Amino acid sequence: MARSLKKGPFADDHLLKKVDDLNKTGSKTVIKTWSRRSTIFPQMVSHTIAVHDGRRHVPVYVTEDMVGHKLGEFVATRTFRGHGKDEKKSRK
């Protein structure tokens, strides 16, 4: 179920503060965050945000197409290792 339109988009305050500080100084350092639930805003475009996937921080370069989506959509939390081998096929 989608978020109510009257509430507006959500982003953690600490993340927005870091982005605003970088925009004021003009630097392009990587922002490390655990906030996968935050919505990407237009002021985040052209920044690199390292999003936590449960094990490590994965860098995500934010483009204009990503605005309105969540940060967690661009970093997978599960890795597919493949299905188990069939014993009958491996014996032959």
Swiss-Prot record:
Gene Ontology molecular function terms on file: rRNA binding; structural constituent of ribosome
Function comment: Protein S19 forms a complex with S13 that binds strongly to the 16S ribosomal RNA.
The protein, known as: Small ribosomal subunit protein uS19
Family label: Belongs to the universal ribosomal protein uS19 family.
Keyword rRNA-binding in record: yes
GO CC annotations on file: cytoplasm; small ribosomal subunit
Gene: rpsS
Coiled-coil spans in chain: none
